[in-house]
């Protein structure tokens, strides 16, 4: 039997979403360039989604998109658009309009199921360019994570080693997930889409043992020891 020419499969990709709050193209370009300079391994030439929910009706999509593209980023879609005129301009430019998913609300009255939480265990170093994804489970890494490496988990992430890469917990939208690390020096830390770049982590906790979680939807950090 001959193999079909194509095959559709589900997959997971890490995409940064840029929430634009200022319609001035030059301000947007400068702000993005500053972010890229701080985390070049994560953002340089990266694919991004532009969220335009914070923009007014008179926004020029052509000027805005050119400002983003001038930084070297690649726009792969646009979200948060409710203005019909802006939608038309985006569609004419050949980009898709995306709907950002939300984590399902948990029923307060529902009795939690007594099921064991799965855990993926990695005992070897995670090197630059590698991506580890723990689908529907927690992730434990007992070795170092190099810059340019990426850890993704739908659950919690534990790193018992030097963390220099990127860690994204609660990837499916669970805001109750946490990140635990014994030596925290990451390029990026994210929980349920809320993230910090390296320069946003308090200097007093860089290289130290720390726990990160969400409090009222805001990323927070606490010393472990």
Swiss-Prot record:
The gene is minC. Belongs to the MinC family. The keyword Cell division applies. One of its GO terms (biological process) is division septum assembly. It comes from Sodalis glossinidius (strain morsitans). This is Probable septum site-determining protein MinC. PANTHER family: SEPTUM SITE-DETERMINING PROTEIN MINC. Cell division inhibitor that blocks the formation of polar Z ring septums. Rapidly oscillates between the poles of the cell to destabilize FtsZ filaments that have formed before they mature into polar Z rings. Prevents FtsZ polymerization. The keyword Cell cycle applies. Keywords: Cell cycle, Cell division, Septation. Interacts with MinD and FtsZ.
């Amino acid at each position: 039997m001959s193999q079909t020419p194509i095959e559709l499969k589900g997959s997971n990709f890490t995409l940064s979403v840029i929430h634009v709050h200022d319609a001035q193209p030059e301000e947007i370009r400068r702000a993005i360039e500053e972010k890229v300079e701080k985390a070049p391994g994560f953002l340089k030439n990266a694919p991004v989604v532009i969220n335009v929910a914070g923009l007014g009706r008179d926004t020029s999509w052509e000027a805005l998109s050119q400002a983003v593209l001038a930084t070297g980023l690649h726009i792969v879609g646009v979200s948060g658009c409710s203005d019909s005129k802006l939608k038309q301009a985006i569609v004419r430019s050949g980009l898709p309009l995306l709907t950002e998913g939300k984590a399902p609300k948990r029923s307060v009255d529902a009795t939690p199921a007594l099921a064991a939480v799965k855990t993926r265990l990695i005992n070897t170093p995670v090197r630059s360019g590698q991506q580890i994804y723990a689908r529907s489970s927690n992730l434990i890494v007992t070795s170092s994570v190099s810059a340019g490496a990426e850890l993704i988990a739908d659950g919690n992430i534990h790193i018992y080693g030097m963390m220099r890469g990127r860690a994204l917990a609660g990837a499916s939208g669970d805001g109750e997930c946490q990140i635990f690390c014994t030596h925290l020096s990451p390029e990026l830390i994210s929980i349920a889409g809320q993230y910090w770049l390296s320069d946003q982590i308090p200097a007093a906790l860089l290289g130290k043992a720390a726990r990160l979680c969400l409090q009222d939807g805001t990323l927070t950090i606490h010393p472990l020891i």
